[in-house]
């Protein structure tokens, strides 16, 4: 989209506020260009939805479409006007658009393993559960380590790598 700089800045603010790591802006541009190919029938299309208050962008989400499924993949919001709950409005709009496109499933993509308030993802789960629907467990994401030595090195470096990735968000806020 034309609003990359603004969207990434809001995403960076969200990552700093909520303490999660993000990738460099070029990663998200690659994801966008890879999946936003409506002329290719085998790939989903995607769209950003942006909420504004008095002309000020305050929240955005990215929704990906594939067949009869819509996927909520990335969400972001500023600290301004959070009391107006723009992220809920965006989800509602995304669900309406998905239905208009013939989607029968709107996938909120991700929940904690155990539903416990001490879990780092509890706030995300609380937000998503407030939208209705049901939790559907799937196989999920897995790591395959063809070389255990490299994997051990990788897993020991992860905290440092995540710190660097978190710094991407701090640089943009």
Language-model region placement:
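Short alpha-helical interface patches
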Residues: 26-34, 88, 92-98, 148-157
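Low-complexity, flexible helical/coil segments
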Residues: 30-36, 84-86, 98-100, 109, ...
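Acyl-donor binding region in acyl/amide transferases
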Residues: 67-133
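A conserved beta-strand-loop-helix scaffold within acyl/acetyltransferase catalytic domains
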Residues: 1-83, 96-97
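A short, terminal or domain-edge coil/loop segment
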Residues: 54-59, 81-84, 100-103, 155-171
């Amino acid at each position: 989209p034309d609003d990359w700089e603004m969207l990434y800045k809001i995403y960076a603010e969200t990552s700093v506020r909520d303490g999660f790591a993000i990738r460099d802006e070029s990663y998200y541009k690659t994801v966008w260009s890879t999946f936003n190919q409506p002329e290719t029938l085998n790939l989903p299309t995607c769209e950003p939805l942006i909420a504004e208050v008095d002309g000020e962008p305050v929240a955005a989400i990215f929704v990906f479409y594939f067949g009869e499924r819509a996927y909520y993949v990335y969400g972001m919001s500023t600290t301004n006007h959070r009391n107006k709950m723009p992220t809920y409005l965006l989800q509602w709009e995304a669900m309406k658009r998905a239905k208009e496109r013939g989607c029968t499933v709107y996938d909120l993509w991700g929940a904690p393993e155990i539903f416990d308030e001490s879990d780092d993802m509890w706030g995300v789960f609380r937000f998503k559960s407030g939208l209705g629907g049901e939790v559907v467990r799937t196989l999920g994401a897995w790591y395959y380590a063809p070389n255990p030595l490299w994997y051990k090195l990788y897993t020991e470096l992860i905290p440092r790598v995540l710190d660097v990735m978190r710094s991407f968000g701090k640089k943009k806020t």
